[in-house]
């Protein structure tokens, strides 16, 4: 099983819960085929964070490596939001771009 941490940087964008759900659905659709070929299944962990929490997540990523295979950071304050992140082996999917 592949575990993907999806961390949302919250901004002042409206209706963020709905946007978060929509983004996760896009990620599932975009990633599921590639992930299933390598790992068998995909489990997504969602979290919301501000800049300081995000910095902590990145700093502690190596210590928490066994907890997830990839980290995507999504900025909800951008009009054309994007999700970019490294997904470690054995997965072949290295970068995701998700647009509205």
Where do the PLM segments sit?
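Generic secondary-structure microfeatures
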Residues: 8-12, 27, 47-49
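Short, mixed-charge low-complexity intrinsically disordered segments
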Residues: 61-100
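Short amphipathic alpha-helical segments
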Residues: 14-34
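Residue-level signal for secondary-structure boundary sites
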Residues: 14-16, 53, 81-82
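Short S/T/G/P-rich N-terminal loop/turn motif that feeds into the first structured element of a domain
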Residues: 1-21
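Generic alpha-helical secondary structure signal
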Residues: 18-21, 52, 91
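Short, intrinsically disordered low-complexity segments
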Residues: 29-77
């Amino acid at each position: 099983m592949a575990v993907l941490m999806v961390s949302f940087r919250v901004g002042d964008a409206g209706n963020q819960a709905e946007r978060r759900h929509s983004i996760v659905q896009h990620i599932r659709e975009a990633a599921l085929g590639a992930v299933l070929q390598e790992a068998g299944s995909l489990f997504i962990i969602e979290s919301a964070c501000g800049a300081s929490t995000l910095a902590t997540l990145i700093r502690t990523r190596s210590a928490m490596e066994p907890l997830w295979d990839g980290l995507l950071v999504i900025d909800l304050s951008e009009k054309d939001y994007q999700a970019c992140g490294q997904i470690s082996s054995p997965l072949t999917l290295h970068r995701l771009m998700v647009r509205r």
